[in-house]
């Protein structure tokens, strides 16, 4: 059976992608590349939640090799031993602060999944959201002013944003769909996110989904592609460094 590719990251220099296949992280050149397995030490059951540090030297991964659930680890970008960052589980990485000092992740600590941050050197985690229902997918704006995330608190899953300390939480999208995993562009002008139908619970595979972008200047949304995908299509930051392209996974491209 062919293992599905999912959750592509674009490297900081724009030369290669990192992606998940079968719980392992692979590296592939953007042009005519062949996938190469990245050494992640003992972390060999990776989830789709991973991303490259602003300086391009580290990869944050979410791995569940150790019993008890997913935890966040750091691995050298060239491969090597995985250093555990979060002690509590489950924890799913989603964002680096622009200065590279803080990681944002989704964690379940009671009966709720909420947004947390933690220093890259480890230590105490800080809970940022307390609303009832799932809060997920935190990713920093390139200027560090906001963390974008998705929340079901208003009924459907919608895109929200807040200050990095958790203050000033405000809704960004207000339509009749379920919107997940917003990622700001490197130039700070756009967010890209994946949209599911209003009757779809979670972000399952094998769905008709839409990839959309919002202009942060005027909040107008346009469709990039309609595709058959879902799980793993665009979990993690996947903009090209020049903000002109987005990497994503489609099981079968429908439009355009």
Residue map of PLM features:
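Sequence signature of WD/YWTD-type beta-propeller architectures
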Residues: 1-256
């Amino acid at each position: 059976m062919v293992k599905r590719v999912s959750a592509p990251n674009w490297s900081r220099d724009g030369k290669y992608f990192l992606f998940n296949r079968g719980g392992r992280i692979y590296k592939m050149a953007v042009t005519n590349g062949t996938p190469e397995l990245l050494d992640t030490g003992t972390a060999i059951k990776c989830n789709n939640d991973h991303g490259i540090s602003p300086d391009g030297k580290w990869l944050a991964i979410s791995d569940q090799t150790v019993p008890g659930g997913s935890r966040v680890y750091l691995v050298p970008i060239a491969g090597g031993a995985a250093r555990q960052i979060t002690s509590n589980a489950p924890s799913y990485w989603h964002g680096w602060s622009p200065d590279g000092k803080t990681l944002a992740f989704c964690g379940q600590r009671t009966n709720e999944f909420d947004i947390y941050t933690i220093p890259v050197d480890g230590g105490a985690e800080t809970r940022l959201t307390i609303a009832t229902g799932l809060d997920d997918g935190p990713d920093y704006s390139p200027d560090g002013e906001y963390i974008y995330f998705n929340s079901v608190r208003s009924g459907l899953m919608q895109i929200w944003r807040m200050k990095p300390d958790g203050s000033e939480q405000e809704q960004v999208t207000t339509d009749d769909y379920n919107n997940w995993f917003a990622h700001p562009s490197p130039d700070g002008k756009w967010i890209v996110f994946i949209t599911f139908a209003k009757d779809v619970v979670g972000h399952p595979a094998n769905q008709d989904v839409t990839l959309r972008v919002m202009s942060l200047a005027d909040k107008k949304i346009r469709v990039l592609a309609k595709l058959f995908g879902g799980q793993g299509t665009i979990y993690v930051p996947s903009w090209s460094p020049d903000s002109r392209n987005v990497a994503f996974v489609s099981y079968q491209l429908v439009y355009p």
